[in-house]
Amino acid sequence: MSSATQHIPFRLDGKVALVTGSGRGIGAAMATELGRAGAKVIVNYANSKESAEKLVEEIKKLGTDAVALQADVSKVPQTVRLFDEAIKVWGRLDIVCSNAGVVSFGHLEEVTEEEFDRVFTINTRGQFFVAREAYKHLNEGGRIIMMSSNTAHAFAVPRHSLYSGSKGAIESFVKVLAIDCGKKKITVNAVAPGGTVTDMFHDVSQHYIPGGEKYTAEERQQMAAHASPLVRNGYPVDIANAVVFLASKEGEWVNGKTIGVDGGS
């Protein structure tokens, strides 16, 4: 077998990936690691133009190509436009990672209709229509990878019902969408991160730890590490590595599943 055609496990050379909400945080790590594996990457952002463009340059340094496309995927017409533009960049689309989302905390008696709609519009409705457009545009044998959370099924957090529920719906989506997408041999899965050290983590970590407001951000991070038997924090690259596996040929037989990426917490 010639080197030109030899399959290298977990490589994504020749593939094109779109990652929504990838200007920073976990999404940026997904885009970076997909690029490191050889994929060309479309970095989607809603507002973080500067960081998205910087990420594009970092991905190019890995020896592949990348572009940034703006769209707010909480708005379906913009999602439709994003995919129409994405398919024109390199003429194909093989991997779609639905990452954009927001966090929310509030006791049941405090939650307003406006907050409910904000969270579900982005975390649930937005992801559903990203998946719809992905199915329309992906090549046969493509990958759809959605974003859940370990709080959707394994880790109940007080005052976190909206967020947890919005992510729990994703786990139901992937089970059914995996069947719906079978005609095109597209697999549909989700990753469910635990606490992951990003700027968002530092903003909200006090909610996850009882009495968390009494501690500094650094102290809360150290305490969070003990949620895992490995006694370390999760980082965006941990989530991204799972995504690369699901996107690869080696991940083909995983379908309709939600993969917990939380260090056993």
Curated annotation (Swiss-Prot):
SUPFAM superfamilies: NAD(P)-binding Rossmann-fold domains. It comes from the Eukaryota. The keyword Transferase does not apply. Keywords: NADP, Oxidoreductase. Gene3D superfamilies: NAD(P)-binding Rossmann-like Domain. One of its GO terms (molecular function) is oxidoreductase activity. Signal peptide: none annotated. The keyword RNA-binding does not apply. It is an enzyme of class 1 (oxidoreductase). Induction: The expression of the dibenzodioxocinones biosynthesis cluster is positively regulated by the transcription factor dibT. Its EC number is 1.1.1.-. SMART domains: PKS_KR. The active site is at residues 148-149, 163, 167. InterPro entries: NAD(P)-bd_dom_sf (IPR036291), Sc_DH/Rdtase_CS (IPR020904), SDR_fam (IPR002347). Pathway: Secondary metabolite biosynthesis. NADP(+) binds at residues 26, 72, 99, 132, 163, 167, 198. CDD domains: THN_reductase-like_SDR_c (cd05362). PROSITE patterns: ADH_SHORT. Short-chain dehydrogenase/reductase; part of the gene cluster that mediates the biosynthesis of dibenzodioxocinones such as pestalotiollide B, a novel class of inhibitors against cholesterol ester transfer protein (CEPT). The biosynthesis initiates from condensation of acetate and malonate units catalyzed by the non-reducing PKS pks8/GME11356. Pks8/GME11356 lacks a thioesterase (TE) domain, which is important to the cyclizing of the third ring of atrochrysone carboxylic acid, and the esterase GME11355 might play the role of TE and catalyzes the cyclization reaction of the C ring. Belongs to the short-chain dehydrogenases/reductases (SDR) family. This is Short-chain dehydrogenase/reductase GME11373. It comes from Pestalotiopsis microspora.
